[in-house]
Amino acid sequence: MNPVSEHVDGAALRVHVVPGASRTEIKGLHGDAIKVRVSAPPEGGKANQALVDLVEDTTGGRASILSGASSRTKVILIRGVDAGSVQRSFR
């Protein structure tokens, strides 16, 4: 399954997040999601904000968590870009 899909408001990106990592980085695929390591701890929304910041910096769109805010597997909505450009950003 592709981790990127079209959404009525832009593109949806499925991610598997590893908080508290030594650095923030994209690490390839984890099942049907893109694996992202963030250095921020999973406390007070810090890891979620680090993830949103990374996705925005990588894609150039506006990102928000669509589902999974308290889970390691999340779906991120990226406004202002299409699924094809998001796929190219994460290659």
Question: Would you name each region that the model predicts?
Answer:
Residues 1-53, 57-70, 74-91:
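Contiguous, often N-terminal, cationic amphipathic patches that form binding interfaces
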